[in-house]
Each structure stands twice: as C-alpha cells, then as structure tokens.
A protein has these predicted regions:
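Short, polar/charged alpha-helical segment
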Residues: 60, 66-95
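A conserved helix-loop-strand patch within extracytoplasmic ligand-binding domains
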Residues: 142-191, 290
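Terminal targeting segments of Actinobacterial cell-envelope proteins
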Residues: 1-28, 54, 59-63
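A bilobed periplasmic-binding-protein/Venus flytrap-type ligand-binding module shared by bacterial periplasmic
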Residues: 149-160, 261-276
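Ligand-binding clefts/hinges and TM-proximal coupling segments of bilobed small-molecule sensing domains
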Residues: 44-45, 176-189, 195-201, 284-306
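Short helices/loops that flank or line small-molecule/ion binding pockets
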Residues: 82-83, 87, 105-119, 183-184, ...
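Ligand-binding "clamshell"
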Residues: 129-142, 157, 230, 235, ...
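Immediate post-signal peptide segment of exported/extracytoplasmic ligand-binding proteins
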Residues: 24, 49-68, 89-90, 160-166
Length: 306
C-alpha cells in the first residue's frame, strides 16, 4: 500500500464479538453430559430399588446390632424390647437394641428397607392396613408376642349393662380397630353382628341388633381419651388411657383380645431366612418373654401374656 492510498475500511463481523475470537458453541456438549449423568443416576437408583446394592444391612451381618422399633415414648413396648436385649438375646447369639421412631409409616418403612430388624408395634390387621396403603412395603408377621390391654372405659358407669338407651359410645376410627371394638361390644352383650360377616372387617353398618340403640362416634386414639368425659363409654387401648391419667378403675369390661389382635413381631420379608432374623424370632418366642409380661410392673395392664 502506498503512502497516498486511502485504507479500505475493514467490514465489522456480522455479530459483534467485542474483539474476542468467536468459537463454536459448547452448549450441545454440556447438555449431552447432563443427560448422561441423569441417566446414570436414574439407573443406579433403579438398581438399588430392586435390591442391587452390595451394602449389607445389620439383618444379614454377623455380630451386628439388631434394632427393634416401636413408637417414641411407648414405655411398655420399650421395656419389653430392652428386656429381650439384656436377658434373652444373648442366649440366642444376637445383640438387640431398642429404637424409637415417629409413627406407623416410618416404622414400617424402616422394617421393609432393613433400617431396623423388626417392630412389635402392630397386630396382623393393622399390618394389613399398612401394606394396603403402601404396596411397596415388604413385611410379614413372624410370631405373636403379647396382647394389648383393651377395654370398655366409662366415667359414668361401672358395668356395661348399666349403659342407658341411646348411650354415646366411641370406637376407634381406623378400620381394624373399629372391627375390634365391635367384636368387643358383641362380647359384652351390647350388640350382635350380621351372620356371616367377617368380624375382623366389620363396621358399624354390619350391626344386626343394637337393643340399647347405642350411638357411635369414631375417634382417633388421642381424641378418644380426651372425649371420655363427654361419652357414656369408649372402647380403646388401656395404654392410651393410663398415659392420659385415666384410672384403670374406669375400665369396666376387659376380656382377653382374640388371637387376631395379638401384637406381632413384624420383620422385613427379604431377610426372613437370615440367621440373624431367625434368631431374633426365636428370642421373642423364648418362654422368658411371657414370664416378663406376667410379672413386670412396667407392662402391667398394658401388655398381656399370650
């Protein structure tokens, strides 16, 4: 170029790159990597969900501590588990410890997934409700352990026959314990159920005769104990009434509960054939457990021997 030539202006790039060199976009590569990571994680989660983990639970590990759960604050069931842990489990070659958990669903999920070895929280019909509501849970009742104290409570009367016409009576609001309450009232001679009805699935609609025209109110465990002063009677678990400060003298009828309502040692199905779980079941079947239930004041009137 000569000194007299006028420089030809350089045309700006079509897209202003502010002086930086424009390179090919990396966005497709980044998206591809993200998709790959998501697929790998999803596959791993699915593999774990179908039992693909190499990690062993305490249920299948020799010498591990086997946790037996019930609800936090349940002193009677805790006392039973701690008795088994101290006095019975060593005879069966295992180590057992108590674990308190928040509620039924949390307990049963922990059993199903092997976070705890077992629970003594429930009877078979309650377990059936849980499994119906949570079809992914894999649990089963391994052996009956005790019967819960269960009775007819009243602030106003001392015998079921004293209940007046149109008496207000409460049953529990969950299906299994509603059925247990109706069985109980039939035993007391206050109602009869329709012929052929499955008594363990009965509801108030299955009542055939009700001579006193009892008026039923369905309440949950805590609400029922609070409502007792406003009721003529209520059918419920002794432990809830004692915990609420209601005297055992208010329990006016208390026959032994049927086998269907025995408290069960519930285990995770996946581990039922492991040595640890077999030994745990044997520990809860040990005769010393029934002797404890007969004699220990911490479980009196609450957990009854079979």
């Amino acid at each position: 170029m000569s000194d007299t030539e006028t420089p030809t202006p350089t045309a700006p790039p079509a897209d202003d790159d502010h002086g930086f060199t424009t390179r090919g976009s990396r966005r497709p590569l980044i998206i591809g990597v993200v998709v790959l990571v998501v697929l790998v994680v999803a596959g791993f989660v699915g593999w774990r969900a179908f039992g693909g983990s190499d990690a062993k639970t305490a249920n299948e590990t020799a010498g591990a501590t086997l946790l037996v759960a019930t609800t936090e604050g349940n002193a009677a069931e805790q006392a039973l588990i701690e008795f088994v842990a101290k006095e019975v489990a060593p005879k069966h070659g295992i180590t057992v410890a108590f674990k308190g958990l928040a509620d039924s669903t949390t307990i049963n999920r922990a059993v199903s997934e092997g976070e705890v070895a077992a629970t003594v929280y429930q009877h078979k019909l309650w377990l059936g409700q849980v499994l119906q509501a949570n079809p992914d849970f894999r649990e089963e009742a391994a052996t009956p352990v005790f019967r819960w104290g269960f009775g007819l409570f009243s602030d106003k009367y001392t015998d079921p026959r004293q209940l007046p016409q149109n008496a207000k009576v409460s049953l529990y609001s969950d299906p299994a314990n509603e059925a247990q309450g109706l069985w109980f009232l039939e035993r007391a001679g206050l109602i009869t159920l329709k012929p052929g009805v499955n008594k363990w699935q009965a509801t108030v609609k299955d009542i055939a005769t009700n001579p006193k025209n009892l008026q039923f109110t369905l309440l949950d465990f805590a609400a029922q104990t609070r409502a007792l002063p406003d009721l003529d009677a209520a059918v419920g678990y002794t432990e809830y009434y004692l915990a609420a400060g209601v005297s055992i003298e208010k329990e006016i009828f208390a026959p032994p509960a049927p086998d269907e309502f025995a408290g069960q040692l519930t285990i995770g199905t996946r581990w039922k054939d492991t040595e640890n779980i077999k030994n745990l079941v044997a520990a809860f079947q040990d005769p010393a457990v029934q002797e404890f239930l007969r004699t220990d004041p911490r479980v009196k009137d609450i957990l009854l021997p079979l």
